[in-house]
Every structure is written in structure tokens, then in C-alpha cells.
Regions:
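Short histidine/acidic/glycine/proline-rich micro-motifs that form metal-
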Residues: 56-57, 83-86, 131-133
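Short, solvent-exposed aromatic-acidic interface loops
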Residues: 154-163
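Active-site glycine-centered loops adjacent to acidic/histidine catalytic or metal-binding residues
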Residues: 9, 33, 53, 81, ...
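Pre-active-site segment of Zn-dependent metallo-hydrolases
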Residues: 13-16, 79, 84-98
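N-terminal active-site segment of His-dependent metallophosphoesterases
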Residues: 1-48, 56-74, 79, 138-141, ...
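Conserved beta-sheet core of the metallophosphoesterase superfamily
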Residues: 49, 88-151, 155
């Protein structure tokens, strides 16, 4: 079993609540738009996986990929910043998501927390919303969940305060 702390769209701001809520996590996953210094602080705290977002600079784009496909506890995961969601996948992922669907598809960008199951492709979609102060969202959010033998469980949406 592995416990994951998932966040996105920090835009250079990392709320101290992230460290409290993710204290018992084994890994942190960031779905892009880190902004300055966020990746370093997260990587010092826990093992970090992530993708760059549309506001991330060249340094971040050399450190993190645009798309990250990997396996965690026998769960096929695909993470990208601009990916859309079931029924409205982004053009750059649409073809592959239907031909080689992951069991878990993670995206950010919209600043809207969303957890949806796509029964057409037997895949869970998660967008953790935005954990930073920049953007139009009103509440900063995180997602925390566990993976055991290819299954997601104990998923929680966490509100960490107003923007």
C-alpha cells in the first residue's frame, strides 16, 4: 500500500497546510503549474513526481515532463497538466486516452477539483483543483488517497482554506 498526496496549480505558493495534510504520505504528485521554488520544497519533504504546467518556466520543463506515465502499486497512472476530463478530454490526450487508457488519469489546469469515473474506458479521473493563491478558484484544495494492488481507496478531498 502507498499513500499519495496530490496537488496542482500552486503557482509559486505552498501553503503550510500541505505539509500537515501530507505528513503521512509516501509520495507527493504535482499535476503542474508549480511556480518558483515549490518543487524543491516538496522534494525535500517527500519523494516527488510531477509534470510541468503552462506557466512553468524552462527550468521546470527540463526537470519535469509534460506527460508522465508510470505504474504505482500495479496501477497504471497517466499525469499531465492540460488533460480535460471524461467527455471533454483535451485534444492532445484524446487519441491515446481512448486507445491506451490508464486506470488513473490525473490532470490540473482548470483549478476545479473533480473526481470522475469514466466507464467508457474503465478509468478514474482526478483533478485536485488548485492549492495556490493565483487563479479564480475560491478555495485551495488537495487530494489524498491510497493505492493497494492496483486499486484506489480512502480518497479524500481536502480544503485548506480560502484563496
Amino acid at each position: 500500500m502507498i499513500t499519495i498526496g496530490l496537488l496542482s496549480d500552486t503557482h509559486g505558493f505552498l501553503d503550510d497546510a500541505v505539509f500537515k495534510h501530507f505528513a503521512d504520505c509516501d509520495e507527493i504528485w504535482h499535476a503542474g503549474d508549480f511556480g518558483p521554488d515549490v518543487a524543491e520544497r516538496l522534494a525535500e519533504f517527500k519523494p516527488l513526481r510531477g509534470v510541468y504546467g503552462n506557466i512553468d518556466d524552462q527550468k521546470m520543463r527540463t526537470q519535469f515532463p509534460e506527460h508522465l506515465r508510470f505504474s504505482s502499486e500495479n496501477l497504471d497512472v497517466w499525469m499531465t497538466h492540460i488533460g480535460g476530463y471524461p467527455g471533454k478530454y483535451a485534444p492532445q490526450v484524446k487519441s491515446e486516452i481512448y486507445t491506451k487508457p490508464p486506470k488513473l488519469f490525473i490532470s490540473g489546469h482548470s483549478h476545479i477539483l473533480k473526481v470522475m469515473y469514466d466507464k467508457k474506458i474503465d478509468s478514474m479521473h482526478i483533478n485536485p483543483g488548485a492549492a495556490g493563491n493565483s487563479g479564480w478558484h475560491r478555495v485551495k484544495t488537495l487530494i489524498k488517497f491510497c493505492i493497494t494492488d492496483g486499486k484506489i481507496h480512502n480518497l479524500a478531498a481536502i480544503e485548506i482554506g480560502n484563496r
